[in-house]
């Protein structure tokens, strides 16, 4: 009964959103789309949505933040909805899981937290980490190869999965910086001692 029957996606509703909010939420959109695309639950039905959302973010987020023009705000509004359609069916990953736990503990902005985490999560996933749980069931790890798909679409170096992983992680980091986000937790007001004090618990909760 909580699920709406209609969603109104009207870019006029977001034209006055401050640039900082556009940056934070836009990077959240990018995280939604990226995690949906490399998810083990991804499918032919979600992949196209996720890739299109990523493309729209890289083409329009910076202008949406700095210029707040109708075209870029419309495209980012569409990207947000498209990414939502993707992750509602493919689910998300460890970046979002950690962002929720970090936000609850340190009261950080959700989208900004994802922006900071995402480059490191991309690099981690690119190492083909060992599976430590029984679900989801899969026989073939593919995140690194799917990052290569993303890098290829964006025109980034992608001759190998390893090269693509690093190129995409760097591109995400640089996009965040261009949008005015300080891409570290110290700038978000998290004390190093407090971070170390809670990091093990947060990692457990995120997992």
Describe the function of each predicted region.
Residues 81-114:
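Glycine-rich phosphate/pyrophosphate-binding beta-alpha loops
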Residues 192-207:
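Short, amphipathic C-terminal "tail helix"
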Residues 112-194:
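Gly/Pro-rich interdomain helix-loop hinge
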Residues 20-82, 86:
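C-terminal and late-domain segments of enzyme folds
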Residues 1-42, 128, 142-149:
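A glycine/threonine-rich phosphate-anchoring loop and its flanking beta-alpha core
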